[in-house]
Amino acid sequence: VTKDPQAKRKPENCAFVIFGVTGDLTHRLVMPSLYNLAAEHLLPEKFCVVGVARRGQSDNELRDSLLKGLRQFATRPVDDDIAKKLLECVTFVEADAKDPPSFDRLREHLDSLECAQDTGGNRLFYLATPPAAFAPTARELGRTGMMKENGAWRRLVIEKPFGTDLASARALNGELLKIMDEHQIYRIDHYLGKETVQNILVLRFANGMFEPIWNRNHIDHIQITVEEKLGVGHRGGFYDATGALRDMVPNHLFQLMSLVAMEPPARFDAHSVRSEKAEILTSIQRPSEEEALKSSVRAQYLSGRIGDDEIPDYRKTEDVKPGSTTETYVALKLMIDNWRWAGVPFYLRTGKALGHKRTEVAIKFKQAPLSMFSGTAVDRLSQNFLTIGIAPTETIELQFNAKIPGPSVTIDGVEMKFRYGDYFRADPSTGYETLIYDCMIGDNILFQRADGIEAGWEAVQPFLDAWKNAGSNGIETYQAGSDGPACADELLRRDGRSWRKFS
């Protein structure tokens, strides 16, 4: 993260190697992000892209495919000159981790390309592949010596999901750390590329009005919501083996939670920030099986209409097992065992096929003493929320009470809202630009470390175990296009609380 936007420096010359270059992720996010960086003059002076896939094609065929993807998914109008210059540096290599000689050919191609284009031997390997290919690909990179740093840097970018449970996450970390050092691994979470997410630390620690009251003495509870309108679609096979908890909680929601709840880092650097984030995840209480079932909600969507689209029952989705117990919605109540947050519940929820698309963090402050308002309309006091909106718009909103004009003391809730777009000019982006740029300059402050990954999985493992033992018992339903299952409201109602209403 660059502190001064005017001080951004060009990354060192490098080769950018994309495994899974023919896939959706490359076309939809990675290449549009590289294009935006090129448009902002934030790519290295000497730069080349090497696309890797299992099925062969020519350099020109790959360039045509990537250009088509740019025109379809770019977040800003495509300048032909910029696109041409970017795509001219693209070459293709056919390689498969199951075919070791193909990785020898990849190494030879990179060696030759680096001599010709003077990229200095620096290499960024981006795994835009299915998770099953992560470890085999890393092993081949290690076997061929392509991760060795001999006067040049070598970095590996890995997409989520990073494991499917605590055991698999530990195993994958173990595999990677046999091959390379922790500083070479960039576990990417695109949520951290969003400006509002990055601004959470600034909001907390750069404003004297917030940090003194950011604790159990003044905060009643915190809600973290990630709602999606889309159903599972054509990803039934993947999703049925994953579910909402595995797909969203250990990464996206825990990243938001750790930024909101972490202690102030000693310094604003990668080691200090990542250590505090891992520490807060380690401090999440581990519930018993009975407590895990009581503190969680899981549900599947039934058929319904969202806009003009008819959404079928989740269990009738292609490649979903007829009697599936995989959740498309999850809500959790979590507690943190430390001095700052003792007794403050964190309510997390995420789901698919819901009536709204939104991502937000809502901090509910404790109610002020009401004795001075005796005899007035105190029942109309609204809740004091500080809400950090991440999607669909990036906002910070403060909800508080004020007197309605008139002779009597009547109180109502009012809002102050800050919208990023009203104050700062920013070109539309994918959210990946900052992350890819940081990978190239070697700033890993926005990327997860092995201990943080494992702490996240350790925190959700009790829920996974409890659900597995419960089988289909406890699976609720909700209609597609609704606000989710009624039992999610009950999770808070038992504590005398309610979810913040979408406005």
Spans of model-derived segments:
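Secretory/organelle targeting and membrane-embedding segments
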Residues: 1-158, 162-503
